[in-house]
């Protein structure tokens, strides 16, 4: 209940012109405290769309705000369905898609978030997108904001 309160409080700040953070400090800390990360048991189709991380570069120091740029690579002749894109955060796989869509441009080719705001610390994102043949591509991205 406390986490819900802070999430609602956090979202209410956004309505008054404050910067929108994709996740709260509380969500990040709770996710990092739980070491049991869920991995799907089903295999992803080899023909599912690929999700390529263009930016940020994970081998460099990342600060907030940072640009997040993804490229969707469907297997021809299928096309990516941008309306199926989902982004799940952390160990508890909190769906932050709606938060992201407030600050992102999403097309069939990919996603661009000019200034993604995340608290300092370690982050895990699960990205999912479906193609016109119903295949779901998935990608796990782990990084640290310093």
Please place each PLM-identified region on the residue numbering:
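Surface-exposed, short loops/turns at beta-strand junctions within beta-sandwich domains
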Residues: 115-122
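Aromatic sugar-binding surface patches on proteins
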Residues: 103-112
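Solvent-exposed loop/turn segments flanking beta-strands in beta-repeat/beta-sandwich domains
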Residues: 75-87
């Amino acid at each position: 209940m406390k986490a819900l309160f802070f999430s609602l409080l956090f979202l209410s700040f956004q309505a008054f012109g404050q910067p929108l953070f994709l996740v709260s400090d509380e969500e990040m800390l709770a996710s990092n405290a739980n070491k049991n990360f869920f991995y799907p048991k089903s295999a992803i189709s080899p023909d599912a769309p690929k999700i390529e991380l263009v930016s940020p570069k994970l081998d460099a120091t990342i600060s907030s705000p940072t640009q997040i740029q993804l490229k969707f690579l469907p297997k021809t002749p299928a096309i990516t369905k941008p309306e199926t894109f989902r982004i799940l955060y952390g160990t508890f796989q909190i769906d932050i898609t709606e938060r992201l869509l407030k600050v992102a441009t999403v097309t069939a080719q990919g996603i661009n978030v000019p200034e993604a705001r995340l608290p300092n610390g370690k982050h895990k994102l699960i990205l999912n997108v479906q193609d016109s043949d119903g295949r779901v591509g998935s990608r796990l991205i782990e990084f640290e904001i310093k």
